[in-house]
């Protein structure tokens, strides 16, 4: 069995925990979808997290991905990290163990200051990164802003490596 560790990183309120919840639900790990705003998200277990509606401590969950060709499955450890700048040290600690990262960007809010910081940290730690534009179903969402930003930053980052 292959094993991968994938971290979800983003500016606060970009939807990391909700994305993790959806992935776990679709993989059959969860029987019901929880919600951060309902205080029943699977990965936000601490009472402070539930009261504030934000992730404070990095959490892990494991799901199994079947192989497309029916050979070897992949065990995926998903790390949901804090997005609030006050807890960025907790997110940075997780970078050392990641095989890949998913940088979540809100389609309604676009790239935020902490998104920039995370992008630079991911480059410094040389973590291969996917960008996921979230909240595209909400009014005011515009994928063009985060996508064009990501394209520009990817070229800048590769030029410095």
Regions found by a protein language model. Name each.
Residues 146-148:
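Acidic, proline/serine/threonine- and glycine-rich low-complexity intrinsically disordered segments
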Residues 1-105, 109-111:
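P-loop NTPase switch module centered on the Walker A-proximal segment
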Residues 112-113, 138-144:
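Switch/connector loops and helix/strand junctions flanking conserved nucleotide-binding motifs
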Residues 112-124:
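Amphipathic helical hotspot of TIR/SEFIR-family domains
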Residues 101-104, 126-134, 153:
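Conserved beta-strand/loop subsegment of P-loop NTPase cores
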Residues 159-161:
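N-terminal low-complexity segments that are often proline-rich with Ser/Thr-Pro
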Residues 150-157:
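Conserved small/polar residues in nucleotide/adenosyl-binding loops
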């Amino acid at each position: 069995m292959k094993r991968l560790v994938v971290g979800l990183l983003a500016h606060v309120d970009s939807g990391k925990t909700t994305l993790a919840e959806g992935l776990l639900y679709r993989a059959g790990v969860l029987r019901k979808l929880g919600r951060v705003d309902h205080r029943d998200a699977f990965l936000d277990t601490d009472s402070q997290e539930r009261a504030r509606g934000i992730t404070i401590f990095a959490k892990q969950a494991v799901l199994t991905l079947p192989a497309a060709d029916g050979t070897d499955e992949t065990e995926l450890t998903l790390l949901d990290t804090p997005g609030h700048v006050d807890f960025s040290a907790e997110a940075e600690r997780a970078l050392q163990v990641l095989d890949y990262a998913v940088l979540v960007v809100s389609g309604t809010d676009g790239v935020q200051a902490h998104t920039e910081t995370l992008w630079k940290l991911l480059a410094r730690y040389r973590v291969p990164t996917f960008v996921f534009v979230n909240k595209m179903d909400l009014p005011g969402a515009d994928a063009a802003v985060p996508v064009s930003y990501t394209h520009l930053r990817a070229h800048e980052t590769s030029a410095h490596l």
